[in-house]
Amino acid sequence: MRLRWKFLFHFFGQMLIVILLLTVMLVASFFYLDARFSDAESNSGLTKATTDTLEAYLDVNEDGTWEVDNFLKKSVDKQHGWMQIIDSEGNTDYSYGVPKDVPGTYTKKELLSIYKTKKLHNYKLNYWAINIEDKSYLLLSGWKSKSEQLLTSVEKREQKIDSLAHYKSSTIDYIKRKKGAIYLLDSNGKILDSINSTKSERKTMNQLELLKYSSKPWNYKREISVKILNKDRWMVATVPNPVYVTDQEFNKSFLKVVLKAMFLVMAVLFMYIIWMTVWYMFRFGLPIFHTIRWLVNLSKGKLEEPRNREGRPVSKNKKGKIKQPYRFFGEIFESMDQLTETLRRDKRNREKIQATREEWIAGLSHDLKTPLSSIYGYSMMLESKQYDWSPEEVKEMGQVVREKSEYMSKLIEDLNLTYRLKNDALPIERKLTSLIPFFKNVIEDFKKNPFSEGYDISFVSKEEHIEFALDEAWFRRILENLLGNAVKHNGKGTEIQVILEQTKNHISLKVKDNGKGMDEETITHLFNRYYRGTNTKDSTAGTGLGLAIAKELVHLHNGTIHVNSRTNIGTVITILFKKQ
């Protein structure tokens, strides 16, 4: 997989994980807050419930049975109460915790009484008109009010209920045991008398507070029940409120829950960020830092991967394989390995080229200096008035000067040719040629050259006819240079064979001799310009550029050239062309 696709899938996966994590955390937080909110609401029973809240917790199955959420049941239990769902006919469709004295069917008169008094027998009631599955129902929530029970007990114990000063001591003890209080109020809400009351409660005991209590009973520490004795007298009973949770306390409690949930979310996110930071440091930081160190090494000429204390490349294990943290960038490290090896190879090649260039310049300087010395010496002799040269001597010196000049001219021409070949600036005109007569003609012309005397040069081919498209002038130069090299570096009596062969797809030309041969170093540099040099004193004088020129001309004909040689056995130079 290409690196950019790796990055794409990797970061897509990371973003997906982050989104999933945030989604899970938000959903979990929502459920946590909902559960805590429900718990807080259930503490006040169903007194805070709204129609929408109740409808959300109720459902009717296809068989007509009711699904009631535990939240509602828990809220009813908190008040030690009961719950009924009444249909439009007044019949009970669902009930929970209903006592035996609560009817299962209600008349219109009873329902009207419930609407007015919010009471049923000894029970206080809350009611809601709800709509489930497009059907209307009445939900009743009833509970035995301890303050109402206190009033009922006092009525039973005392004949004159409005004469608090004459209550029996047993009645007063009963009121105190129930942690209750009894108040007698006039029509203006003024306290006329009280039993077991407190100063703070007396301050808030008025008609306005009684009305407020009826709308939000959970905001009051004391549960209140009122009995109208006559138009001028009210009796009020109070006991500890079992569903006392003020709106302010509820909001504070819920805020704490929200803050706690936010803290948990932030803590999880913080831990995730720390984990991702460490993970990214090992996943991306180490490989990137290692790559930078590697590039710094290369820039300083240290052509190797950074190593650990054991001397092993940092990204590799003992088996030479890429370590786990570095595998994601495997392609980059492979490229870095290739780059490092290429730089090493280029450095070695530069060093070899530098050495070859120095040798080439030294040899070329030598071969230019030698003929120049001869020319300079003879010119000085001819210029001198000290000697009187005969015509024969002048002719002999002129011949030497001409030969040395021709050699230098040939050397310059060969240098120019090699650079033209290197820069693809040499024109070539290839035409289909019959190779056997062409090679025989070139060999015969070469054998006529005086410096080829004493060498057994022959042409061998088992084929009768072979054709190939070539430039005759430049191909003649190839063969002459190869033959000249064989003659130049081997003694007289050496057998030199030019062998022409063909296969189904290729044509091969071999120049084979049984001469001195070459060592490996000479073979390696054989086609470098002026590697072996030359000397104008040799009878087989040349420029030292013959094989370099031959190689470039072979490449110009889309061929390849190879050398096989063994010291004291001989040399075979093979040229291979692909048939067109």
Swiss-Prot record:
Segments passing through the bilayer: 7-27, 262-282
GO cellular component: plasma membrane
Extracellular side: 28-261
Principal location listed in the UniProt entry: membrane
EC numbers: 2.7.13.3
Residues modified to Phosphohistidine: 366
Residue ranges the record marks as coiled coil: none
Enzyme class per UniProt: transferase
One MF annotation (Gene Ontology) recorded for this entry: phosphorelay sensor kinase activity
Membrane topology summary: Multi-pass membrane protein
Short name of any one Pfam family annotated for the protein: HisKA
Side Cytoplasmic, residues: 1-6, 283-580
Compartments in which it is found: Cell membrane
Domain Histidine kinase intervals: 363-580
Catalytic activity: ATP + protein L-histidine = ADP + protein N-phospho-L-histidine
Role, per record: Member of the two-component regulatory system YvrG/YvrH that positively regulates 7 transcriptional units (wprA, wapA-yxxG, dltABCDE, sunA, sunT-bdbA-yolJ-bdbB, sigO-rsoA, and sigX-rsiX), and negatively regulates the lytABC operon. Probably activates YvrH by phosphorylation.
Protein name per its UniProtKB record: Sensor histidine kinase YvrG
Organism: Bacillus subtilis (strain 168)
Encoding gene, per UniProt annotation: yvrG
